């Protein structure tokens, strides 16, 4: 009796495994919200300064109003910060090329924003959809003060 139950259990397990649907992995596509199919261009529309989570000031920096930020969907995760005609610094490059990264676990988008630094910085993605994005970076050691940067998508390929 015991061997019959083992046999039936084995047959059921083989049948369950043999009849299961083939698993086809789908590629990770969440980052396409940043890049589109090939690339997506964003512009900054607003800065907010916060203190203890409350917005204390809203402003726009004139020299960044015509800058463009291009995220590419290639395997290198290429990124370009294209400076417009209004320069923030005398030695500001017309195009700053680098890489972008995104960590879903921490909602961190790492990229260069020349107004802050010539190096890539980690921004927390607060909200993002196909047309708008809001990122935040803290500027003090206690994480009580931050800048929130609002972007609008203006071109997608």
Residue ranges and their predicted role:
Residues 15-18:
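C-terminal motif of bacterial Sec signal peptides marking the signal peptidase cleavage site
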Residues 20-96, 103-157:
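Lipid interaction determinants
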């Amino acid at each position: 009796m015991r061997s019959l139950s083992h046999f039936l259990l084995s047959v059921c397990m083989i049948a369950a495994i043999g009849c299961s649907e083939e698993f086809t992995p789908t590629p990770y596509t969440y980052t396409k919200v940043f890049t589109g199919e090939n690339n997506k261009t964003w512009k900054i529309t607003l800065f907010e300064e916060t203190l203890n989570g409350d917005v204390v000031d809203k402003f726009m920096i004139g020299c960044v109003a015509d800058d463009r930020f291009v995220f590419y969907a290639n395997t290198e995760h290429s990124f370009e910060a294209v400076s417009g005609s209004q320069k923030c610094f005398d030695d500001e490059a017309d195009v700053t090329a680098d890489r972008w990264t995104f960590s879903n676990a921490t909602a961190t988008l790492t990229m260069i924003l020349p107004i802050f630094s010539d190096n890539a910085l980690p921004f927390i993605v607060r909200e993002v959809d196909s047309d708008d994005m809001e990122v935040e970076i803290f500027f003090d050691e206690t994480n009580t003060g931050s800048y929130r940067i609002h972007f609008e998508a203006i071109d997608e390929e």
